[in-house]
């Protein structure tokens, strides 16, 4: 990796015209300074889109930046043509795969300190955080993490043909189209399908999908070729109140299967106690 150019601009506040004292302390800038030196968001956004060009991929620290970017674009009616599905690299996740347990999420500052890098500027400003993130990327085993894209879901599939299927080797991810309500999403045939993410063959249901709340569902299946597969899907909502599912199917073993069974048993006991009005 090598730097080609930088894009770093201050935005003139238009919607929120006050800064909390803590935010001002972290950013080391006042609202008066932002008003004075900041630029109009629409101008900066269009310059940024032109700066990106046609051949790019976003690399962020965390998963929320691109959602907020598009939310602001829509608020200001700025035209943009990001790809669909919108794949990007969450460097925080890639760092965890390379240096942690793949599940933990550490701060940018902790990652920089762990790698023994110089801290020549502060944190929490867009420019400095982007520079620190770019310094971490060459330290990753990129051949190991290259396939682990993240998917931004600010925009979701609009129909069955656009639904997203990704295979990451030991697990597969599916993102559904939008539905009118949670129940419709949770009961959709494709959302609850039990086809192996590797061979696409129908699996045997060992534990049917069950919910632990109105958002999360779990299941356990067996593929004749690929063995035990555990499943989880969550129902989420978009800004315009569409409901969609993100489903993960992952290879597991007997121990992983036992954990799913234990989770199901705990949920049954919880519901039984709730019906009877007895303490758990």
Walk through the language-model features, giving the residues of each:
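Short, conserved catalytic or adaptor-binding loops enriched in Gly and charged residues
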Residues: 1, 79-82
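Active-site-proximal helix-loop-helix substrate-binding element of RNase H-like nuclease domains
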Residues: 15-18, 24-27, 31-34, 94-130
């Amino acid at each position: 990796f090598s730097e080609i150019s930088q894009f770093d601009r201050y935005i003139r506040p238009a919607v929120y015209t006050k800064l909390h004292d803590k935010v001002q302390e972290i950013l080391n800038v006042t609202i008066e300074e932002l008003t004075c030196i900041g630029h109009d968001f629409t101008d900066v956004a269009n310059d940024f889109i032109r700066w990106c060009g046609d051949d790019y991929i976003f690399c962020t620290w965390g998963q929320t930046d691109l959602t907020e970017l598009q939310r602001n674009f829509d608020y200001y009616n700025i035209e943009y043509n990001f790809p669909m599905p919108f794949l990007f690299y969450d460097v925080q996740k890639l760092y965890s795969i390379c240096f942690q347990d793949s599940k933990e999420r550490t701060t940018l500052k902790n990652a920089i300190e762990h790698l023994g890098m110089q801290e020549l500027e502060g944190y929490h400003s867009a420019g400095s955080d982007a520079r620190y993130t770019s310094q971490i990327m060459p330290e990753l085993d990129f051949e190991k993490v290259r396939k682990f894209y993240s998917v931004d879901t600010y925009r979701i599939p609009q129909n069955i043909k656009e639904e997203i299927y990704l295979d990451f080797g030991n697990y597969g991810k599916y993102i559904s189209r939008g539905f009118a309500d949670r129940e419709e999403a949770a009961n959709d045939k494709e959302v609850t399908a039990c086809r192996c993410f590797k061979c696409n063959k129908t699996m045997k249901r060992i534990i049917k999908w069950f919910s632990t709340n109105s958002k999360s569902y779990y299941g356990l299946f067996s593929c004749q070729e690929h063995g035990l597969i555990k499943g989880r899907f969550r129902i989420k909502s978009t800004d315009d109140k569409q409901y969609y599912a993100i489903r993960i199917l992952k290879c597991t073993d007997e121990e992983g299967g036992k954990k799913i069974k234990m989770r199901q048993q705990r949920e049954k006991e919880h519901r039984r106690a709730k019906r009877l009005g007895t303490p758990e």
